[in-house]
Each structure stands twice: as C-alpha cells, then as structure tokens.
A protein has these predicted regions:
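C-terminal regulatory domains involved in ligand/effector binding and gene-expression control
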Residues: 1-75
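Flexible, active-site-adjacent loop/turn segments at secondary-structure boundaries
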Residues: 13-15, 56, 88, 99-104, ...
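Solvent-exposed alpha-helical segments within well-ordered globular domains of core cellular machineries
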Residues: 33-40, 83, 113, 117, ...
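Ordered, amphipathic secondary-structure segments that act as subunit-interaction surfaces
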Residues: 65, 75-104
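Helical mechanochemical/support elements of P-loop NTPase systems and associated helical scaffolds
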Residues: 73, 77, 81, 108-111, ...
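Glycine- and Gly-Pro-enriched alpha-helical subdomains that act as flexible
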Residues: 94-97, 104-130
Length: 130
C-alpha cells in the first residue's frame, strides 16, 4: 500500500496586493471529473471575477496533473498553483485561485508570486492527512 498526503477537507484563504484580491479554494478530489466539478462550482460562485485559475494533482503517485491560466498570460497562474501543490507534497487535491482585478497590472513576475502565494496560503489553511 502506498502512503500519500492529501487534504482532509476544503479550505480557503485570501491575499490582496495592489488592489487585486486573490482567493484560494482547496478540495480533496479522487477523479478528474470531481476536480472539474469543483472548478465549475467556484466559477459559478465567482462569476463576476476576472479569473478563476486552477490546478490539480491526482493519483497515489501524483501522475495526473493539470493546470489552467483562465485568461492570464501563459504560465503565470495555473503553473504556480500546480507548483504550490507539489511543494506541499499533496495529491488528490484541486486548488482554484479567484482573482478580482484591482486596476493595477502586476506583471508576469507579480502574477506568478501572487498566485503561488495565495495557493500556498489556501493549502496551509487546509487540514491534511496521510
């Protein structure tokens, strides 16, 4: 039997930088369909947000990975969220980071840092189990 670390329940955290508000949502999922359903639910909840970027890691060996920038410049949102999941050593988890644009452009580096930091905050606020 392979032991892996995952989230025990849903979590959330928020972060604000230069008037943009970022909100992370995390959830334990077992399948890609569950991950997609969670992303869809967050998009419906925050239909008025500029972006709802996401990433997930599935499987005991973390072999299934997916990220989505949802209109942000390529590689500035979904991939940093995915990296945060991997840095926390988690699998069977999905993270969605919602962004409400505050009118000030953050640049590629600023977006990467903001999405990564917000995802990490969300994961740190979520109880985990092995």
């Amino acid at each position: 039997m392979h032991i892996y670390k995952t989230t025990a329940e849903n979590g959330t955290a928020s972060y604000e930088i230069q008037k943009s508000r970022f909100i992370a949502y995390t959830s334990h999922v077992e399948t890609e369909a569950e991950a997609r359903d969670f992303v869809t639910a967050i998009k419906k909840k925050h239909f008025d947000a500029r972006h709802n970027c996401s990433a997930w890691v599935l499987g005991e060996d973390s072999s299934q990975q997916k990220s989505n920038d949802d209109g942000e410049p390529g590689g500035t949102a979904g991939n940093p969220i995915l990296e945060a999941i991997k840095q926390h050593g988690l699998t069977n988890v999905v993270v969605v980071v919602t962004r409400y644009f505050g009118g000030i452009k953050l640049g590629a580096g600023g977006l990467i840092r903001a999405y990564s930091h917000t995802a990490s905050l969300g994961l740190e606020a979520t109880p985990c189990l092995e």
